[in-house]
Amino acid sequence: MPAARLAIMADDTNYGSLGALAPNWSDGERNIDTDEIYERFFEWVADVKGVEPWPHQEEAIMDLLAGDHVILNTPTGSGKSLVALGMHFAALCTGRRSYYTAPIKALVSEKFFDLVEVFGRENVGMITGDTHINADAPIICCTAEILANQALREGRHADVGCVAMDEFHYYGDSERGWAWQVPLLTLPNTQFLLMSATLGNVDAIADKLENMTDTDVDIIADAPRPVPLTYEYTLDPLEKTVELAFGRGETPIYVVHFSQDAALETANALASTGVSSKEQRAAIAEAIKGTKFTTAFGKILQRLLRTGVGIHHAGMLPRYRRLVEQLAQQGLLPVICGTDTLGVGINVPIHSVVLTALTKFDGTKMRKLRAREFHQIAGRAGRMGFDTEGLVIAEGPEFEIENAKALAKAGNDPKKLKKVKRKKAPEGFVTWNENTFDKLIDADPETLVPHMKVTHSMVLNEVAQGGDARYRIDRLIDDSAQTPEQKERLHDRADEIFQTLFDTNVIETEDRDDGGKDYFMTVDMPDDFALDQPLSPFLLAALELLDPESENYALDVISMVEATLEDPKQVLRAQERQARDAAMIRMKEDGLDYDERMDRLQEITYPKPLEDMLQAAFDEYRHDVPWANDYWLSPKSVIRDMVETASDFTGYIARYNIARSEGTLLRYLSDAYRALARTVPLEKRNEQLRDIISWLRVVVRSIDSSLVDEWENAGAGTDASEAAANLAAPGTKQAVVEDRRGLTVLVRNAMFRRVQLMDLDKPDELGALDKDWGYGVHEWEDALDDFYDEHEYVNTDAKARSGELFILDDSKENSEHSWKVRQIIDDSDGDHDWAITGTVDLDTTQSSGEVVFFDYSVSN
């Protein structure tokens, strides 16, 4: 919880200690000479950090104090963060606003809290697509795209004194690299610190930066690794490799996979082999005591952790990832199985890295690892202050491991050796060997290939700056590090965009006396159109197409919002798979032949409500609002599907069998909640939509509260210190029910889900839901038999789901923390003599995100 974390920091003895050594930002006098800055900073490093700086750190900070740019191309663990601290401190002492940029929000957020701790909350702010905290602070943490857009919008006039660009190897990213290049080209008065462990040859970047800013660029690339690495290639099975490393005390071990499924498969295998001691398992059990593993994957994780095996990948809930990181930081996990995401911003101290392959699927094809990818992963081995060396082990391909096993079994017996049948690589398999490994070890990271693009958003940001926007866009292209052919294509693209903006009367020009032109916009452009919700204006316009009196109005609003969100691909694939499976069964029953079934199957995909209407509206919108051409709609039904099927988080995960993608679903639900809460005007919300928004908040917050708290305490315009004070206020009495509307919807959905399953005659699913409170499969079979003896069917229409058939008694809310609820079943005869009745455990329900009962019955 960000605000709570800020409150805790305020009690730290060293909180804000570096910021206290700088002049107050609001004072007029802020010019301390460089010698004094150097002395104050390194005294603080010695007294507070308790470390002695390395020569390359001192050199980098002296270069920065001299006004030079610095490219810090030094190994993982070599103290790049300390150099960035020195830059921020120097900026604070000289009245310059400084920026820290990173590629992912999680890393930006982590750095924000780190900087708050040393500089004080009044000196540090954060800006991401959906979060603004103390945005006028002298030190700003933000994503690279935020700074790039500001650079385009404000140019040389931007209040950006210096920038520490972390993970600068993203300069070579084909999709996002433009955001790392643009500031270098458009901020001539800004000082840059470019940092990464895997930059490769940066001479071209240094030359370009020096030419653009007329300032020297110092490259520091000769720092030794604080913890040297040793390398080992093995044909032992993975379990044996881990067992041997464990026996030699070479833990913690991070086993790197290139898919989430493979990571879980290995974790399960290792959990049964005994990779932890009795003492370690006892310590882990104590450390996770009180942790709630409420989801399907949570129960898997709990079992793995108790054996000493962790798992870490992007598909997990954030709180589970943080738990694994915390246990690793405490030295409690001997083995962690994860994906290659550990290379960016993941704080997991490890001694040994084991690569299960030297190839990966890049979204298009299987290929061998690039040198940069290899060093990014391998560089995490070896813990500064703990290890004298780190270990990097690469596993051979599976077929080679089996061949080695067969040869070892044959021993030195010539006859047996002759009989060994060597396996070959499967057809089309991209293989590797020890030579591949050796080449990767010796290879320097590839020279970064620059990337640039021109979009409507970029052009409009330049127009917003005033003056001759076309000249500046042409200069941006000409100054870029792209090839002549690429520049020609970029100029052509700029021609198209400017012509579109003129044709649609979005921009106009005025001639200047000096022969130049001034560009200006004729329409108001949303302040955040290029950030996290660029299609919000379209959504507001599209809402006018809906009839508020329609019974589907709330669901249609949800479908419109969902169409503007990023796809949760694993969830959509599961929906499509289930739809195709059901269609295949129907087609077989209808007697269709195989070829026809296959042809029809290709046409079946996941649900896309309002697709035709939305696409027609969007086509018209793009004609009037050209910058929307940078984006696209993606109709889908996840929130709507959950509402229509009365599903909670756990039930939805089970329904589509996506336990390994819990984090993906939760992030999507969180994004949907934010979009609904922020974008849909109050006057466009009916009672049902307000209920759904509240329910969604309860679901997200109960599964992982940080995703809601981070936005509500920080992103909705609340000052961080104010949020901290609010959350830390002593004596605050918490209500038993935090969000009555949302919790009521959660309970009503749970009750009606049972009604839907009664209609489908699904005693197995009902029993799975209710076995913990005495209504297992057999009890439900008996209840359904009795019900259908009296009535022909169950209604599940809007009337059956109405509030008239749901009764809530909250008289014991405060005394017993419970609600008595009764869902009357709308039977075929309209007798309404059957009902599901239960006493809801409010505390457990709110913490778990699914309804938990004290007692329960189904009867007439």
Predicted feature residues:
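Compact beta-sheet-dominated globular domain cores
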Residues: 826-860
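Conserved interdomain hinge at the start of the Helicase C-terminal
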Residues: 232-258, 265-268, 322-331
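Helicase-associated low-complexity/disordered flanking segments
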Residues: 1-62, 66-70, 275-306
